[in-house]
Amino acid sequence: MKPHFRNPVERMYQDTFSDNFYNRPILSHRNTVWLCYEVKTKGPSRPPLDAKIFRGQVYSKLKYHPEMRFFHWFSKWRKLHRDQEYEVTWYISWSPCTKCTRDVATFLAEDPKVTLTIFVARLYYFWDPDYQEALRSLCQKRDGPRATMKIMNYDEFQHCWSKFVYSQRELFEPWNNLPKYYILLHIMLGEILRHSMDPPTFTSNFNNELWVRGRHETYLCYEVERLHNDTWVLLNQRRGFLCNQAPHKHGFLEGRHAELCFLDVIPFWKLDLHQDYRVTCFTSWSPCFSCAQEMAKFISNNKHVSLCIFAARIYDDQGRCQEGLRTLAKAGAKISIMTYSEFKHCWDTFVDHQGCPFQPWDGLEEHSQALSGRLRAILQNQGN
């Protein structure tokens, strides 16, 4: 029988960290959960009061899970410091299981002076509806204090390496595809928690002025429908938004465009090959040449998926970008310019609007008409 790792340890070996915190979304034979924690009093730049590691087996009794071990220790320690407010941070190899997630939510509800931030390397059973609901319950904010859950990126892995690993002063060396796996998990967690976009982010990036400066990011909102009895049925669990990854962010040396990040995550949806699906994207910029080529390849290789793209603006509509849009349309994608109807739909669906209605900006319809004419000319190979 394997030990239950009752006592916390201060550090782990390098191979142990690299093996157990490897962030490939689908991973087998990682049955030990490692939970690195830091506890500090609330306040800016306060040093941690305690920082150690709990371990536990995935399939052991609940009380042996590292999350429960932490709260068993913390509850006893908390009795001596009842009036103090604390910030707790976890860096954990697997996100908590369903039962642990519910127990964590209960603990936080009963002790509002404790806030918890959870950085996870991988998501546990992210496809299970009951687990998704448990995560949403844990992370909801409006009914009281809850946890904040995020996916570990390069900075968190580097921090754990320095704080919890026998690093021998060696620098953390990220494994192949760490940034790509981070983005996949980040998108999937956003779907589960139903993240919403800030209103200023939407209005700034989706403004459809004909000539804009300083809009270097591409935002992509998406939703998926399945054909059922000749009717398109919206799949609520398959909608969200993402943006491109800038160079040197999250470990990407060269950056990655939003459309490619989106294509990366679709295989994890496990769409039924015998069903028909319609994917609709609302993008702040139309795809560049390379992204258009990749999207064309995708729909050519996945005949059960149709693609509709509504763009707020046309990206660099000269030369190869025009060619890319024509290639994408020829492959079967429907490409259109966003109008008031699509802007309002995105506002209602993807933005944390707090009940405020969509307010169109000056010139929205005029800009949409002008851009629609330009797009028609491009797709008809007439130039400007």
From Swiss-Prot:
Zn(2+) 2 binds at residues 257, 288, 291. CDD domains: cytidine_deaminase. It holds the Pfam family NAD2. Keywords: Antiviral defense, Cytoplasm, Hydrolase, Immunity, Innate immunity, Metal-binding, Nucleus, Phosphoprotein, Repeat, Zinc. The keyword Transport does not apply. Residues 209-336 are annotated as: Necessary for homooligomerization. Its main location: cytoplasm. Its cofactor is Zn(2+). The active site is at residue 259. It catalyses: a 2'-deoxycytidine in single-stranded DNA + H2O + H(+) = a 2'-deoxyuridine in single-stranded DNA + NH4(+). InterPro entries: APOBEC/CMP_deaminase_Zn-bd, APOBEC_Cyt_Deaminase, CMP_dCMP_dom, Cytidine_deaminase-like. Homodimer. Homooligomer. Can bind RNA to form ribonucleoprotein complexes of high-molecular-mass (HMM) or low-molecular-mass (LMM). HMM is inactive and heterogeneous in protein composition because of binding nonselectively to cellular RNAs, which in turn are associated with variety of cellular proteins. The LMM form which is enzymatically active has few or no RNAs associated. Its ability to form homooligomer is distinct from its ability to assemble into HMM. Interacts with APOBEC3B, APOBEC3F, MOV10, AGO2, EIF4E, EIF4ENIF1, DCP2 and DDX6 in an RNA-dependent manner. Belongs to the cytidine and deoxycytidylate deaminase family. This is DNA dC->dU-editing enzyme APOBEC-3G. It comes from Pan troglodytes.
